[in-house]
């Protein structure tokens, strides 16, 4: 499945939660979900009963949309999560959070994961001093993530850091905002990752 290219706020209303797809509007409280917290379309406010499979599929789609991951990539991450010791669902979320595009987003260098992905693919991000343009790269503990020198004054990056300053930085990352770099200090615990995803349903779906 290709990445979703449609109206993202309509998508958020369909899922009923913020997917952090519209950065500035979300942070300013002006998103469509803030104004109309029900599904889109003529029958958006009507409640319908969903099957177990429907709930599982919806949860997977929600996670893919939130993190901007294709079906092929998502399944590959699930396979790795299932291979690791521990809870598969928790492993899944922790692995996704280690993706380079997500880490750039978490550091506040972009207001959305989509914008963070563009920074990476266009070569504006350094990992341990070397340019890395692979959004799916899994960041390791202790690695330094930095915006390239020529990009540090980019208006979009500066604006993103102004907007994200109000939301704070997750506890597994240290950021030097003035110098526009951060350290991925450790792998996150599941309870630290605040996302509206029930990974248990995703595990159930892939385990069929």
UniProtKB/Swiss-Prot annotation:
Q: Output the Gene Ontology cellular-component terms.
A: small ribosomal subunit
Is Ribosomal protein among this UniProt entry's keywords?
yes
Q: From its record, what is one biological process in GO terms?
A: ribosomal small subunit biogenesis
Per UniProt, which keywords does this protein have?
Ribonucleoprotein, Ribosomal protein, RNA-binding, rRNA-binding
Keyword check for rRNA-binding:
yes
Residue ranges of every copy of the S4 RNA-binding domain listed in the record? 98-161
Against SMART domains, the record matches this protein to: Ribosomal_S4, S4
Which segments carry the region annotation Disordered?
A: 31-50
Record GO terms (molecular function): rRNA binding; structural constituent of ribosome
| PANTHER family xref list | 30S 40S RIBOSOMAL PROTEIN, SMALL RIBOSOMAL SUBUNIT PROTEIN US4M
Which NCBIfam families does the entry link to?
PRK05327.1, rpsD_bact
The job of this chain, per UniProt, is described as: One of the primary rRNA binding proteins, it binds directly to 16S rRNA where it nucleates assembly of the body of the 30S subunit.
Of which family is this protein a member? Belongs to the universal ribosomal protein uS4 family.
On assembly, the entry states: Part of the 30S ribosomal subunit. Contacts protein S5. The interaction surface between S4 and S5 is involved in control of translational fidelity.
Q: What protein am I looking at? A: Small ribosomal subunit protein uS4
Q: Which organism is it from?
A: Helicobacter pylori (strain J99 / ATCC 700824) (Campylobacter pylori J99)
Instruction: Identify the taxonomic lineage of the organism of origin.
Output: Bacteria, Pseudomonadati, Campylobacterota, Epsilonproteobacteria, Campylobacterales
Q: Which gene encodes it?
A: rpsD
């Amino acid at each position: 499945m290709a990445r979703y290219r449609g109206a993202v706020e309509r998508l958020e209303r369909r899922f009923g939660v913020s997917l952090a797809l519209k950065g500035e509007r979300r942070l300013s409280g002006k998103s469509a979900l803030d104004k109309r917290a029900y599904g889109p379309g003529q029958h958006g406010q009507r409640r319908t009963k969903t099957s177990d499979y429907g709930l599982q599929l919806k949860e997977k789609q929600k996670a893919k949309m939130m993190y901007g991951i294709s079906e092929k990539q998502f399944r590959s991450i699930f396979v790795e999560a299932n291979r690791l010791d521990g809870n598969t669902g928790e492993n899944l979320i922790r692995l996704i959070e280690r993706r380079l595009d997500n880490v750039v987003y978490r550091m506040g260098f972009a207001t959305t994961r989509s914008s963070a992905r563009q920074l990476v693919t266009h070569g504006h991000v350094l990992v341990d001093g070397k340019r890395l343009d692979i959004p799916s790269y899994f960041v390791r503990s202790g690695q330094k993530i930095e915006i390239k020198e020529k990009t540090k004054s980019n208006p979009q990056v500066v604006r993103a850091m102004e907007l994200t300053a109000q939301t704070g930085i997750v506890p597994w990352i240290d950021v030097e905002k003035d110098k526009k770099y951060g350290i991925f200090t450790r792998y996150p615990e599941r309870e630290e990752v605040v996302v509206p995803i029930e990974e248990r349903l995703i595990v159930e779906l892939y385990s069929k």
